[in-house]
């Protein structure tokens, strides 16, 4: 009798800071894809980010706090520890080698799906993992027209996307950082431990 195939999700991001939409996406992926485990990976040196990220130690700590109570989530530090540019394809290859026979599911948020065609070796990513995207990112094509290459219906890649049903959550790290800079409350957007960490370390403050 053969053992069941392990179903492993992979959710990466800057998590600068992690917020409630990240948690909702993780919980949706675990439930809808019937995952045995979801690896959450804060990025290291993000080649595609024009904005300088917060220190890796802060983003890692906030990510651990944010996902601490989500069953089946494992915060994976490998991209933070990796020297040089961080590429998702390298992480997927490592996970495949470490978990032979496992089925990999790459979980993307709306913003990531829009520019998936610009990712390093995106064709190889699609061969290694099943790409799963928050439904709004692949159903609202008029919103997916920004960027150098997007995930609209004219792009062949969305044919390989598996939709995840997600509530409409107008939350973003950009909005949270702006609220902090404007001395506004962020508790409706992040968990209490993350809000406390941000306050304790005075992250994202402009003055």
Residue ranges and their predicted role:
Residues 1-207:
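Nucleotidyltransferase catalytic core that binds NTPs
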